[in-house]
């Protein structure tokens, strides 16, 4: 975690890392002095992957129908794991403020490890905050849901990414690739 690096952990890992020919980092700020070559590979999306390729309008509608999302009304979407750092409860609170002015729907879609007790607690908190609003769709998706995520983003009027600590997530790049406004 770059926001709070642990020097003792780095020193422990360094001896293992230097046993390789090269170390790959996603940003220059993450690299550290090493005796081996370092390479920068910035995070990116795959435009031809299932998560980002063009989809037919019929396919997008099919996914929305499966989840009972009405494409005729504005859709606000956040794609992320169910994690407190993604602030899904804060997203619901923001949606409720918007809902006072615009008849819209909210989709919170993502996954997480089923063996992560905190992730399941977050999901429970989100479901509790969303209950009694039929226009909030909390979708806990399996790992192989790239087409569904793609369709949900393409059906969206606006995509949110309310991460509390992440500077710029790939879901932002994916939504922008699909020409969706991102907040």
Regions found by a protein language model. Give the residues of each.
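Short hydrophobic beta-strand element within catalytic cores of glycosyltransferases
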Residues: 181-183
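Aromatic "clamp/platform" in nucleotide-sugar-dependent glycosyltransferases that forms part
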Residues: 164
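Conserved donor-binding/catalytic core segment of Leloir-type glycosyltransferases
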Residues: 65-86, 92, 106-107
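A short, active-site helix/loop in glycosyltransferases that binds the activated sugar's phosphate group
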Residues: 3-64
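Short glycine/serine-rich donor-binding loops of glycosyltransferases
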Residues: 169-172
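A short alpha->beta transition loop at the rim of the catalytic pocket in nucleotide-sugar-dependent
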Residues: 157, 179
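Nucleotide-activated donor-binding/catalytic signature segment of Leloir-type glycosyltransferases, i.e.
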Residues: 110-151
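Nucleotide-sugar donor-binding and catalytic loop/hinge architecture
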Residues: 53-75, 99-102
């Amino acid at each position: 975690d770059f926001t709070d690096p642990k020097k003792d952990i780095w020193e422990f890992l360094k001896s293992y890392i230097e046993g390789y020919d090269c170390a790959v980092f996603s940003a220059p700020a993450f690299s550290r002095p090493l005796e081996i070559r370092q390479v920068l590979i910035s995070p990116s999306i795959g435009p031809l992957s299932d998560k980002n390729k063009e989809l037919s309008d019929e396919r997008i509608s099919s996914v929305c129908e499966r989840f009972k999302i009405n494409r005729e009304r504005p859709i606000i979407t956040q794609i992320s794991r169910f994690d407190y750092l993604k602030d899904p409860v804060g997203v619901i609170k923001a949606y409720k403020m918007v809902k006072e002015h615009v008849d819209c729907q909210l989709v919170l879609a993502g996954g997480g490890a089923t063996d992560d007790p905190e992730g399941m607690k977050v999901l429970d908190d989100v479901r509790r905050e969303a209950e009694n609003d039929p226009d909030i769709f909390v979708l806990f998706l399996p790992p192989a849901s790239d087409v569904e995520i793609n369709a949900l983003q393409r059906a969206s009027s606006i995509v949110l990414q309310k991460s509390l600590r992440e500077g710029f997530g790939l879901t932002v790049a994916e939504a922008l690739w699909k020409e969706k406004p991102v907040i």
